[in-house]
Amino acid sequence: RAVTQADYENLAYRMHPKFGAIKRCSVQKDLDSQKRNLNMYIVSEDTAGKLTLANSTIKNNLKVWLNQYRMINDTIDILDPYILNFGVNFVVKPQKMSDKFLVIERCVEALKEHFRQPLFIGEALYISDIYEVLKNVTGVLDVVKANIYIKSGGDYSNSSIEIEKNLSSDGSYLAVPNNAIMELKFPDVDILGKSR
C-alpha cells in the first residue's frame, strides 16, 4: 500500500523495467487541489544515458502499476518536469610547478565525475560543491571563480531558468523549482576551464 509521497516514489522506481524505466521521480502534493491529489514528476533516460521526457506508454504503464497500490482517495497526475541543461565555467590558479593544461584537464574530469549522475527533480545545484571539487584537484592552488550557465535550444532542452533570480543570497546554490531537474548534458563541451 502506498501511503506517503515517498511510498509512491519507491513504487515508481520498482516498476518492472519491461514496462519502462524511470530515471528520476518526485511526488508532491497538488497545492491547487482540495482533494488528496498528488503530482508525480517522472523523467527517463535515452540510449545515450541523457535525460528525456517519459513517453505516454511509460506513463500509462506507471498509472496501471500504481493503481494496484494507491489509497482509494488518492488521485495521481503523472507529469513531465522541466529539464534544465547547464554548463560550468571555472578559473583556477595552478600551483607554481604544475602543468596548467594538465591541471585544467584534471579539473574537467573531476567535474564530469561529480555530475555523472543527474540531480534529483527539484534538487538545488550547489555551486559551493563545484568550488570544493575543484579545490581538491591535484595541482590547484586556488579556485578563482566558478559559475553555471543555462544551455538551451538545439540539442539541449528548450527550458530555461533565470540564474540570478534563483541564486541563494550568498551565491552558494541555485534553487531549482520542484517541477524541474538540472542536467549537465554534454560534459565534454559544457565544462569550460581556464587557468590564471
Mark where each language-model region is.
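An aromatic-glycine-centered, glycine-rich loop/turn in mixed alpha/beta architecture
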Residues: 1, 102-196
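Carbohydrate-recognition loop of C-type lectin domains
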Residues: 1-124, 184, 191-196
